[in-house]
A protein has these predicted regions:
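Alpha-helical multi-pass transmembrane bundles of energy-transducing inner-membrane proteins
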Residues: 24-26, 115-119, 123-208, 290
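Cytoplasmic-side transmembrane-helix entry/capping segments in multi-pass membrane proteins
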Residues: 28-35, 110-118, 163-170, 241-242, ...
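Structural signature of hydrophobic alpha-helical transmembrane segments
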Residues: 2-9, 83-91, 134-143, 210-219, ...
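Transmembrane helix-loop-helix hairpins at membrane boundaries of multipass inner-membrane proteins
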Residues: 2-3, 18-101, 105-115, 191-196, ...
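Juxtamembrane/interfacial segments at transmembrane-helix boundaries in multi-pass membrane proteins
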Residues: 50-76, 174-231, 235, 257-281
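Single conserved hydrophobic/aromatic residue that forms the stacking wall/gate
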Residues: 288-299
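Membrane-interface helix caps and helix-loop-helix hairpins in membrane proteins
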Residues: 106, 128-136, 267-271
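C-terminal ends of transmembrane helices
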Residues: 16-23, 97-107, 149-157, 226-237, ...
Length: 299
């Protein structure tokens, strides 16, 4: 088994352990053991990665593994990491570990809460190790689905409103993202959804890039709280439980930025360069709204 698959296997084992656990002590034991294992694995991966780079390994992605899932659509379980994804895995593991203790006394439905929390964590880790477009999208959605319940059930204040608003906006972003990913795949003429191979082909027509890039960037940008699609974020943060807010701000929103870089800008660099003026306008809007806001959580 590839070492990177540990980051999906551990949450799966945690889900099984939580499902079978009886009593609060057993539930906490499963969470602490699993979160500790993820943290240790991320630290080990960081040292292994640095060791490979120090030894002169210049491969774009390290610790690669590919397993074909569905041949007709060329969907594979393809994993690999570079410096950015290694850093994000380490950050995610730290937040999952600390978030576990932040939820130590959470009531009610402690078992169900940790089941959804673990499922969200699995989606995050799976997304950061994936290099296949379909697999990335699958883990991306796995990470988003639990947010509705984690906020709507265990949140506070206007939790139902915040959860519904978050869900509707992220669903809209996911629809744009799915269209963009399919457009990239069919437009590239590739026989695989592996983003490294699509990037090497580099044959997505510029006219198509100008269509698929905005859709993909917008799809990820909604989760990354890209202006003006950020209005769900303040409500979500204010209503979410502490640990969920930690994971939300520290990791989940980073999925959006990582996806913009890893898929949109990496696979369609010409469109990214041509449409860079949009980023300048959005930056100006962000500075203006930040100056006008009277509550920091609304920035």
């Amino acid at each position: 088994m590839n070492f990177l698959s540990i980051f999906v296997l551990i949450p799966l084992l945690m889900l099984a352990g939580l499902w079978a656990a009886r009593g609060i002590k057993a539930i906490r034991g499963v969470m602490v053991t699993g979160a500790s294992a993820l943290l240790i694995a991320s630290v080990v991966l960081t040292f292994l990665y640095l060791g490979e780079r120090s030894a002169g390994n210049t491969a774009e992605m390290l610790f690669r593994a590919d397993t074909l899932w569905y041949a007709p659509l060329h969907i594979s379980y393809s994993v690999g990491v570079d410096g950015i994804s290694v850093a994000m895995l380490l950050l995610s593991a730290v937040i999952v570990f600390t978030g576990t203790f932040a939820s130590w006394r959470l009531q009610p439905l402690t078992k169900e809460y940790f089941l959804w929390f673990t499922l969200l964590s699995m989606g995050v880790f799976g997304f950061f190790i994936s290099v296949d477009l379909f697999t990335m999208f699958m883990f991306y959605e796995i990470a988003l689905i639990p947010m509705y319940l984690l906020i709507g059930v265990w949140g506070s204040g206007r939790k139902e409103y915040a959860a519904m608003k978050l869900t509707l906006m992220l669903m809209g972003g996911s629809a744009f993202l799915l269209i963009g990913i399919l457009g990239i795949y069919f437009g590239s003429g590739a026989t695989t959804m592996n983003l490294l191979e699509i990037a090497q082909l580099h044959n997505i027509p510029f006219a198509q890039q100008c269509i698929w890039f905005p859709l993909t960037f917008l799809g990820f940008g909604v989760l990354g709280a890209l202006f003006p699609f950020h209005t769900w974020s303040p409500d979500g943060h204010a209503s979410a439980p502490t640990a969920v807010s930690m994971l939300h701000a520290g990791v989940l929103m980073k999925l959006g930025g990582y996806g913009c870089f890893r898929i949109a800008m990496y696979l369609m660099p010409e469109a990214a360069n041509e449409l860079s003026w949009i980023f300048l306008i959005l930056t100006g809007c962000l500075l203006y709204t930040s100056d006008a806001a009277d509550d920091l959580i609304g920035v």
